């Protein structure tokens, strides 16, 4: 049979399938005429055209809805018959809910007569149009207020940019933070970002560790010296204390614990002498933080002062002096006669940090203090207020009020003392700033100026925070703060310019990493354990490559300003040798010097895809295919649901209770194909309505196994049939034709992605009143060639993003 190529065209938002010979021959005149007639017929019958309510819509409602939602019976207090004006505001909620119920096949009930595909489409088109027309007569709605706590991911990135402290596997104070919840697919949703007592405890501990790591708290006024007399030392082994004297009668240690605020070089000194006039020779060591600096004591009853330079870390360390057993015997062998008497220790001193200057301060310290220190012209209290005002404005992402500066300066004053360094005295105030609700939450307090919907337009600082956490998952930078302070950021032109600048910044990788992984639902791959017997070992290197691929695709589309349709299908992907083997792809060769290095071979790189690769876009990446599979086998339902939810924005309702899952065919021993099993499952009327939407999509992806490899036979060794018929009668065969169908529905995909990004950026579940904004965003994106950067920019410029509703009084943070 001659192979055909399949193309999809869209007429009035409805896909139409055209098939052409694989050799690309043009259609005959007769075939072209037939298609032209079909296209004109489609236009004439009005695919997507708005039907007349009284003549076309009301009869459908009467036939399918009035029995349960009419004058005689009004279940749920829904009565379609009593509507006198279908385009009046009171009907808006009813039509919006009806649209959702019909779109998700929840209404009419499965045991009632069902509309045909054409009737359902006609109803949905009218309902959507009715909601839009009603919305056009009402003021815009910014949506319910959301008080959003920083997620763990945002907290780490904010601390990095605020404090200049890098987080890695060796230093991550957020490790024990409670896991963030998720709602509407994203952990940025304010509904799940509460604070528990465990959060408070962890925030305090994390802030203290970060501040200690970031700032130099001692040494800027000169090295500090600690001195401990003999009686203040702890003894161990042959070390003794008697009448205020410390001495060794045998090998042992004399130590003192000290808290080092600043890592660096220190000088450790000890005053040591023999206790009598006998000649002696003994091996000792100055000890600090498990390090030993050895020295030999050879004197005749005289006091010896010895010192060594030693590097110490920040934190609690043990310093002191040790009399070493092993060296004692060897040293005595060379002495004149056996060792007699005692070794006496008068005192120990520690001085440091040494050689510390303002020029040598770490970047993290400069970010916190901005070069501000007390001087002859600036008192310590004045310097503290300057630091608090400057650092606090960055921490709170807005200027502090005079009362706030006074409050935190009071915390400094309570700690301040002549013997305490300025930086050390500032620590409690810095900690208080970092555990304030105004740092941990993105607070948008009420103001006097109201917008059209009774809410408020965001000021420059609030808008800057929304923008930076949307694109960077972190705080605004200096340029964005400056735009906010000048008032320019609320202008369309400046807001657009800043958005483009920030998308070009490396920090925008957070959007790909944080948004894309949640939108695609691939975080579960981190813990996905496919059955080894069937799929082999999913090693760490391969798993990392699998997780990186869709993120890099999303990032590349942003970086190159490509069409968002490349998320559906593209002629490139990202892979390394590990992923190339999984996909059976031949990667372009690396230069000889790179080929020899394993690290280079494992780097992900952009590669072109051959026409028969069956890859391209994110749907056919191993990450998505694993996330929508079971550990032992594929799942038509999960894959179909994934496409409906994440590409088309039409998720099915939750499954009916007590409906059994499909068994594992390889284990059950049945010879039924997947298609035969699904047909049996769909015989249950509780399952049929949803499965008729999900299963065809899953069938089209059946050539991919549970870890994303291409195959021709399924787990039970049955030949795979990847043909599928959708509810509207459209037929597709395999993933390539499915992608073409999805491309024909590019406006649905654009609208779905717009809704997902808006949900992520606003931190709340989408509401019916968001439909108007989503429609405007997706329409503007389509006009500009479906560019992903345009979609993001239009979201930033949208009414919901730039405005908010009133915050209920019980949500206002009162703590400073």
Predicted regions and their residues:
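Beta-strand-rich ligand-recognition modules
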Residues: 273, 279-340
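Long, ordered, helix-rich scaffold segments
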Residues: 422, 440-465, 476-558, 728, ...
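Aromatic- and Gly/Pro-enriched helix-to-coil junctions and flexible linker segments
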Residues: 46-226, 322-328, 335-374, 385, ...
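Short, low-complexity, charge-dense intrinsically disordered segments
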Residues: 15-26
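Bacterial N-terminal signal peptides
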Residues: 30-43
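Extended surface/linker regions that mediate inter-domain or inter-protein docking
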Residues: 126, 146, 154, 158, ...
